[in-house]
A protein has these predicted regions:
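Short, Lys/Arg-enriched N-terminal segments with co-localized hydrophobic residues
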Residues: 7-21
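Charged catalytic cores and adjacent phosphate/nucleic-acid-binding surfaces used
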Residues: 15, 23, 214-374, 382-400, ...
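Charged, compositionally biased N-terminal leader segments and the immediate start
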Residues: 21-46
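Accessory alpha-helical DNA-binding modules that contact the DNA backbone or grooves
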Residues: 23-24, 38, 48-254, 275-276, ...
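Two-metal-ion RNase H-like nuclease active-site motif
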Residues: 207-210, 368-372, 443
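Short, conserved loop-to-beta-strand elements that form functional interface hotspots
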Residues: 435, 440-443
Length: 609
């Protein structure tokens, strides 16, 4: 089944694997279950009115501000907008028992492989139903065969172009097989780190590899511990509740498969070896090569266990300094300490030699954030809930940017609804007081020709504007680039959202000339978003050094559709650090008293021009 809400469903699945129910079924889990039922009914070709009833119920649950269990016990679930008596009874069963038999039975009617087809870009319920019923295709392998032998192209409503796009989606899925997004693994990785830290026999612990370097996806997880009792620690690692199966087990290395599907490795070393192992297993490979070369230049040999003199009769190595911490190793090699996120051999050694490494941004530097959605479009939390969550996180401001009218699939707001929301925001700001502010904005669609979804008269009434591409992804690079540059040329556009439209491990970025867009952003004073949603992390970290050199500012935005997703900011900070960004490069490190001027700067410049 597709991950409709990623982390929430993944957490639910892990709990089920462990053979215990969630202590309380959440609103998101109920909404996910109802949406799954709607999708399965659509797969079966059921009555559209029945499907719509479940979709309406999903929407009703998403916007419901009360307690579902209390409503179930009081018999008032039917009072929620969009929920009829029959579905109310199903919801009551789900929230009180943790299971819904009709959902389980319905899922059992389908071949297991059919749900994997949802992972293919462009394959929705209608197309999956068509290939299933007309061609008896029940999994991705059969779908690929059907595309290659012409059967899929020959179906009504498909054609050669659709078949080619499906094949591309299948190839993309193969390419990404075995990779995991940060949002899928971070919670479990941090939990494992906490559990290892609390182990009585563990002296030091670290996560290494691409996770520590904050790459956008990971193939596996690498944990490192130092201990005097390797047998005990290794045995406890493979017995952890996350473990589905043991791949290999030994005193110095153990590999397991977690219930989430990712492989996790534990390496066990002596405490004196820890800084060397930590550096080596963090990588990257290219970074490690340079580290070893620098050691050899001093007459030393460096590996994952030690730094020592080269064993050669004619060499006169420098005295080997004592290394207790990873920073000591860099110092010994004539370098300032290089943060893990920068270890890609992309300029960090030169900067470390010249003492010009940046002081990278920290999560604690953020004072607020923009590009957040509410239940007025496709969000699952109300305006007030989003504001309360931001306040609880210690933020000073929150920018709301619900979808604009062309995003019909996301319940985009028209002019009337948008201005009503602005009025609501102004009123809520008065209620919340002077120490916190909600900024009224909109995520405005960029049309194919580069025009915007709202005219300037509407945009001028907003505090800020995010503009994004949400349709027609298949343009050539030149046309897509021209489209985006035209859009950000509007003086009311404050920031450009998710530059490439990519969905990590799911949808490839559309073709766009990053350098040209960055130049245009610099020329117009447009902020570029670093979309912190772990499915996006867009603009990619590789382009931020160029943007920074051109004076383009970054806004780290969570693209939150729920209160819990505001915390996606931490993933954005990881990517920003990987892009060499400091607090001065990111606009939402500015306090409330200064951010208004930042948001208004482009518009004011446009007035003077």
């Amino acid at each position: 089944m597709p991950h409709l809400r990623g982390d929430a469903l993944a957490a639910l699945s892990r709990s089920a694997y462990r053979g215990r129910l969630m202590p309380e079924v959440t609103k998101d889990q109920v909404a996910d279950t109802l949406e799954e039922i709607a999708m399965m009914l659509e797969l079966k070709g059921e009555n559209p009115f029945k499907i719509r009833a479940y979709r309406n119920a999903t929407r009703g649950i998403e916007t419901f501000a009360g307690n579902l269990r209390q409503s179930a016990e009081a018999g008032t679930l039917g009072d929620i907008e969009g929920i009829g008596e029959a579905i109310a009874q199903k919801i009551a069963t789900l929230v009180t028992t943790g299971t819904l038999e009709s959902h389980t039975n319905l899922k059992a009617e389908f071949p297991p492989g059919i749900f994997d087809m949802f992972d293919i870009s462009g394959m929705g319920p209608k197309k999956i139903h068509a290939v299933w019923k007309e061609l008896s295709i029940t999994d991705i392998a059969e779908l690929e065969k059907g595309c290659r032998d012409g059967r899929v192209a020959g179906m009504k409503g498909f054609g050669e172009k659709t078949a080619a796009n499906i094949l591309k989606g299948i190839e993309d899925r193969k390419k990404h097989a075995g990779r995991f997004r940060m949002g899928e693994i971070a919670a479990d990785a941090e939990r494992m780190l906490d559990d290892l830290r609390s182990h009585p026999e563990v002296l030091r612990v670290a996560a290494c590899g691409s996770y520590r370097r904050r790459r956008e996806t990971c193939g596996d997880l690498d944990f490192l511990v130092s201990t005097r009792e390797p047998k005990i620690v290794s045995k406890d690692f493979i017995a952890h509740e996350f473990v589905e199966s043991v791949i290999a087990h030994g005193d110095t290395k153990s590999s397991v498969r977690w219930l989430s599907g990712i492989q996790a490795d534990l390496r066990v070393v002596k405490d004196a070896e820890f800084p060397f192992a930590m550096n080596y297993f963090t990588g990257s490979k290219e970074h490690n090569i340079v580290m070893r070369q620098r050691a050899l230049a001093r007459g030393w040999t460096l590996n994952e266990y030690r730094l020592g003199p080269v064993d050669a009769p004619k060499t006169k190595p420098e005295p080997v300094p004592e290394i207790r911490e990873e920073a000591d190793l860099y110092r010994a090699l004539g370098l300032d300490y290089i943060e893990p996120e920068l270890r890609e051999n992309m300029g960090e050694f030169k900067a470390a030699e010249e003492h010009t490494l940046p002081k990278l941004i920290e999560v604690e530097n953020l004072r607020g954030t923009f590009h957040n959605h509410t239940t007025l479009s496709d969000g699952r939390s109300t305006l007030r809930e989003m504001a309360d969550a931001a306040i609880e996180l210690g933020l000073q401001y929150l920018g709301i940017a619900d979808h604009s009218k062309s995003s019909v699939q996301a319940h985009g707001l028209d002019e009337k609804a948008l201005l009503a929301q602005v009025k609501e925001i102004r009123a809520l700001n008065k209620e919340l007081g002077p120490d916190f502010r909600i900024f009224a904005g909109s995520e405005v669609d960029i049309h194919k020709d580069g025009s915007l979804d709202f005219d300037d008269e509407i945009l001028a009434q907003l505090d800020y504007v995010v503009t994004s591409v949400h349709s027609v992804f298949n343009l050539g690079e030149a046309e897509m680039t021209e489209r985006i540059i035209k859009a950000i040329g509007n003086r009311h556009v404050t920031m450009l959202g998710h530059l490439t439209g990519r969905l990590l491990l799911q949808r490839e970025p559309y073709a766009v000339d990053h350098a040209a867009v960055i130049e245009a952003a610099a020329a117009t004073g447009t902020i570029i978003e670093l979309n912190a949603n772990p499915r996006r992390l867009d603009m990619d970290w590789r382009w931020w050094p160029l943007a920074k050199s051109k004076g383009v500012k970054c806004a780290i935005n969570p693209d939150a559709h729920h209160t819990s997703q505001i915390q996606f900011l931490k993933f954005g900070v990881g990517t920003a650090r990987k892009g060499w960004l400091t607090r001065d490069d990111v606009v939402n490190t500015q306090p409330l008293g200064k951010i208004e001027a930042v948001l208004a700067a482009k518009t004011q410049r446009g007035k003077k021009a």
